[in-house]
Amino acid sequence: MPVKWLLHWQPNQGSTFSSQILNEVTQSIESLNGVKEGTWKATLNYYKPMLQDQANQAEFPREFVGISLPEEPDKYYFVIRSQRIVVEADSSIQMIMESLQSYKCKLSFYFEGLEYQLGDFRLRVGKVVPTHAETIRGVVMEVEYLPISSMGMAKKLMEEFLEIWQEAMSKRSLPGKFVNKELNFEKFGLGDNYTPQHTAVGYAFFMANLMAAIQAGRG
């Protein structure tokens, strides 16, 4: 599959997320002659073990995330960051987990927005919202370079594209910027050839940062 970078919006100190940011981002894409292709949606669930016996606590991961991706609707991805494990499963695994009741979904977020084609690039821009709530907790942008699946080969082209993109965004004087956090996929046993597992790991790390930010805000 095409190489993908997952960027997240980093607001300036004191500013917050809003739908206005999404509007400005989509206008920037359209100003670069991006063609709207439709909508997209992904979901991310945050699981914790339901332990009957606390003595067994060490045998179970303390937490992990489950992710459904729009490009792989029949699959479900689990990421256990603490053990550097990423697993692809059939989407029906969610029903099995509910029946087993060994893990409980504590939090759910969905990512939804618009998808654009811009030359050889596909851009997905979306808001991050907790299920059963309207508060925007984040803004993400997926950048795919369609002709190449090798991360090493695509890196320079992706960096050049992002320079053009950041320049276009800077004209709008928004209170923040998109940030690309480079991850060490090798620690998860993933190679240079991009796969949906790479995307799942990216979302898992995004989720970890998001949860930390939410908890810091409450603190």
Curated annotation (Swiss-Prot):
GO molecular function: transcription coregulator activity
Annotated InterPro entries: Mediator_Med20 (IPR013921)
GO biological-process terms attached to the record: regulation of transcription by RNA polymerase II
Domain of life of the organism encoding this protein: Eukaryota
Keywords per UniProt: Nucleus, Transcription, Transcription regulation
GO cellular component term of the entry, any: mediator complex
Disulfide bonds: none
Localization per Swiss-Prot or TrEMBL: Nucleus
Its job: Component of the Mediator complex, a coactivator involved in the regulated transcription of nearly all RNA polymerase II-dependent genes. Mediator functions as a bridge to convey information from gene-specific regulatory proteins to the basal RNA polymerase II transcription machinery. The Mediator complex, having a compact conformation in its free form, is recruited to promoters by direct interactions with regulatory proteins and serves for the assembly of a functional preinitiation complex with RNA polymerase II and the general transcription factors.
Protein family membership: Belongs to the Mediator complex subunit 20 family.
Subunit structure: Component of the Mediator complex.
Name of the molecule in the record: Mediator of RNA polymerase II transcription subunit 20b
Gene transcribed to yield this protein: MED20B
